[in-house]
Structures are given as C-alpha cells and as structure tokens.
Design a protein with these regions (language model features):
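Gly/Ala-rich beta-loop-alpha elbow adjacent to hydrolase catalytic centers
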Residues: 42, 46
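Long, contiguous secondary-structure blocks with strong helical propensity
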Residues: 47-51
Length: 331
C-alpha cells in the first residue's frame, strides 16, 4: 500500500504506565489525529492498549477503564503462592524446565477485563494491530538463556476467533513471574518487552518493516528521559517523521519510596573498598524508579498517569493537527 500520509502508533511496555498511553490517545482524539492512524504496534501493556484503541476507540471509555478497573490486574494467584506450588516449583528447577515458577498474578482476572472491554467482533475498519511477544523454546534452564527465545508478531485483526485474539494479547503481556506463559498452538509465549531475551519493549520495527502507508510515526514511551536518556534507535525511518511522546516527569507510584534507601553512588565511589559497587547502585536505583510506576496498580496513580499522558500528548503532538482544526482554534 502506498503512503497516504497516515500515522503509525508505537506503544511500549510498562505495566500500570499503560494509563499514560490512554491519556495520549485522548490527546490524539482531541487533536483530530485518530482517523489518520493506520497501524498500531504494541508490546505487553502496549499491545493491550493497541487492541483497545483500534477496536474500542472511544478515549473516554478507555481512560475511565484505566482509572476504575485496571487495578484489578494486580489480583494475586493464591494457588501459585501455596506451599504445594512452591514445592512443585523447586522440583521444576531441578528438572531444568524453562519456567520453573508459576505467575504470582491471576491471569483469569486480566482475561476477564479484556473480554469486558473488547467487542466480540473485530471492527472491519480498525487500524492494523501488531502485538509482539517472545516464543519460549525451552531447554535446560531456558529462562536464563537468551537463545531460548524468539520474537513473534501476532496480527490481531487477522485472527477471526475472539478467544484466540485474547490469548495472543495475553501472550504479549505475560510478564515472567507475574503471569504464567501462554500456550498457543502448542507453543509457549511470554512478554514481548523482555529486552534482555531479545524482545523489543519499544516495538518500532513492525511499523518500519510492514507499514509503508504511514508518513508519521508516533512513539509513546513509558519512561521519562531522566530514567531512559538514550535516544530511540530508528534505523530505517528515513523519509518519515518520528515523534516521541514520553513522560515529562517520571511516572511514580508508592513503591518509589524504596529508591530513597539506595546509597548515593558518588559517595560510594569515594570509598575505595566499596567503589566497585557504585555502578551497581546506580542500576538498582534506576530499576526501582522504573518499577515504581510499572507496578503502581492503584486508582490514584493511574488517574495521575492518564492526566500526564493527556498533557504530554497535547504538548508533543499539537503540531500534527489538521489545518482546519488550527483554524477553528483561532476563532
């Protein structure tokens, strides 16, 4: 398909920070950009949002869902926390199975929420949706071996069966230790945002490789420049306008208080016997700040994330407004 001036939307993983993406979607609606979206690529929570944006569309409904229902995702899987489950997990470790532990969260709750939000029939006029995942091919202690994983792209709108579409979305968001791996057609899949295993937490590649009909790519990242200062690697984006939308301030939840207990790395560097630990402390503090927002599945935090996504989305994307929208604003 030839380039028609459309928009490709990229949604990263980030757990509860998916609420930020919902706010950006609301901003895109108010700026008159949604009808230009031709394809959406998402990983993990970004895949769930991609499907909701394409099939549900209504930003108010989606934002309300994030503010009032998404916290249910954090429901623990009590069966997997039992002593018997822990015993079986230890046996699996000794047997060398790829995923010796079951997920700590109840996947059936997430499945129920998606069924509640999503229509049974996929809209024929919806943008293309690509959900990225990692196929786990097993092997001895495969969870520690990057060669045991292979990237997988699910084209959600091309799957006619609603239940299989659901499982493909869950497969993209099956974060290890959080949710059990998802089995589809005899293959097991885990969260596609697991960069350390070859995943792509900012799934730009599917848009660049498979969507020639877009001239503008909007990339919504979950982490602020304070945490993730590295610029986006966008090889192959020549000739396209690439716009990043990221939090202007770090998305923090209650867990953020723990980062304050990490000693200052610069202070540690001045102590010869502890200096080698300094870089590790920086990494630990950074990871705690990332997790702070990722696991902030409480209504207050997610409402803040929605508001921040809306504000940051308006600021970053205002220049993409159609000219007729600009004219109305100046009346």
């Amino acid at each position: 398909m030839e380039n028609d001036g459309g928009i490709g939307l990229v949604l990263s993983g980030g757990g509860a920070k998916g609420a930020f993406q919902a706010g950006v979607w609301k901003a895109m609606h108010e700026l008159g950009l949604i009808d230009r979206v031709r394809a959406i690529s998402g990983t993990s929570v970004g895949a769930l949002n991609a499907a909701a944006f394409a099939a549900v569309g209504d930003p108010e409904e989606i934002c309300h869902f994030w503010r009032t229902r998404a916290e249910e995702v954090a429901t623990p899987n009590l069966r997997n926390l039992s002593l018997d489950s822990l015993r079986r997990a230890a046996e699996n470790v000794l047997a060398g199975k790829a995923f010796p532990f079951h997920g700590l969260l109840d996947r059936s709750v997430l499945e129920g929420l998606i069924r509640e939000l999503m229509p049974a029939e996929w809209p024929s006029d919806a943008p293309e949706v690509v959900a990225t995942s990692l196929e786990c091919r097993g092997g001895l202690f495969g969870e520690l071996d990057s060669s045991s994983y292979r990237r997988k792209r699910f084209r959600i709108g091309e799957e006619p069966d609603a239940e299989k579409r659901l499982q493909e979305l869950i497969a993209s968001a099956a974060i290890p230790w959080g949710f059990d791996p998802v089995e589809i057609d005899g293959r097991r899949y885990v969260d596609g945002g697991w960069d350390e295993k070859g995943g792509e937490n900012v799934p730009l590649t599917p848009i660049l490789q498979d969507c020639p009909n877009v001239s503008t790519i909007v990339v919504v990242r979950s982490n602020s420049a304070e945490i993730e200062p590295e610029p986006l690697k966008a090889q192959g984006s020549e000739g396209k306008t690439l716009i990043e939308v990221r939090p202007s301030a770090t998305l923090k939840g209650p867990f953020n208080t723990l980062s304050g207990f990490v000693p200052d790395a610069d202070f540690i560097r001045n102590l010869p016997f502890l200096a080698p630990l300094a870089d590790n402390l920086d990494a630990i503090d950074r990871q705690l700040r990332i997790w702070s927002g990722t696991f902030a599945f409480d209504g207050g935090s997610m409402s803040r994330f929605v508001r921040q996504g809306y504000a940051d989305g308006l600021a970053a994307l205002r220049r993409l407004r159609p000219k007729e929208k600009l004219n109305w604003d100046t009346l």
